[in-house]
């Protein structure tokens, strides 16, 4: 749980939140856009998105794979902040929340695999999905969310980011998001497939199926939120309401 909190929310989001404050409160959107201060950082963020996604594909250690994924998705937030326009801002702020929910689900699921069967590397996943079906369902839902499948929180995020980039005339950024999503399929879905369809040679008799309910319930809740925020985005419980309010405040004067 501590690893999930640190790697998905507490520490890694601090830098992204700092840039949000820097751009929107210290300099202001109008100054940043007028002086084109956003462009060099936007290109750097785009490079980091692709680099993190590409590196994640080749990681054997599961937590390291998610760490590179986090590097990539934090740069989604930075790029969305830097791209001109209200929709990009909404996508960035929405991803600040949604990514935390989806990524903490993935880390908690990996923690469950490690706790129950000592799984830390990709090659050790064989058959664990059949032994821990609920954990694997939660992992699958969060993975589909990060990829950007419809009816997930991740789809809503990418919809705003991509539409915002198109409206700003920065079509290159749309292709960056597309390529990253494709790479996400290659580093997340093999985990699901190997967990479900890999043949395990280890003896697990007597170990039971899932982990303690105290470790199982949290990822199921966050996986449910991944779906809920994608299916009911306009509802008051959705982060979208707060994101719209913040974006309106930021761009209200322009």
Identify the role of each PLM range:
Residues 1-193:
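Hydrophobic transmembrane alpha-helices and their helix-loop junctions in integral membrane proteins
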Residues 132-135, 185-254:
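Cytoplasmic/organellar membrane-interface segments at the starts of transmembrane helices
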